[in-house]
């Protein structure tokens, strides 16, 4: 079936000398993998490998057989051109990190318009913003909701957080229970927008602490999720 849809590229793997396997999150059908034959060849004119950089928002015409095999793309073009993301090393590094997180966390091969629009609008916000130091933390916290693993937002007055149950609680020193500054800082991100002025989160250590917590939380609740390799690059750049 020929489908025309918006799509967000997640990553691609080299396949043979001239081809790649591209993973995309499509607006029409959720997660899809495509075999792009000859796309790395200098002779290939219809599709350019440069179109498929991580988290590029595309408009594609694709053949979807929906049999669990690799699909094919007939044509692709930029749907929303970024002005700053690919030119700003800090934004670009954040995008590489988030593309890896999304690749590891999105597994559903079905339509999820809410998740698609969240990712798209988040990227547009990042591209237009000059104050994005906490963007990736906001993104991860919001992503939990779309993945169905967002923590309960009741009992916010309690000082502990049980990572296994995803609830705020009285701190009890059990394996999955945390408290202190980390819990207080996590609460700041619940229900806030990207442009929230969180002056308390003003150092690399605080951001790193929150990111490590969120990654661990995702590992607990998403069995196949493992630590993104791009984290170390992110930390190195922002230190």
State each model region's role.
Residues 1-20, 25-239:
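Non-catalytic alpha-helical scaffolds and adjoining flexible linkers that form interface surfaces
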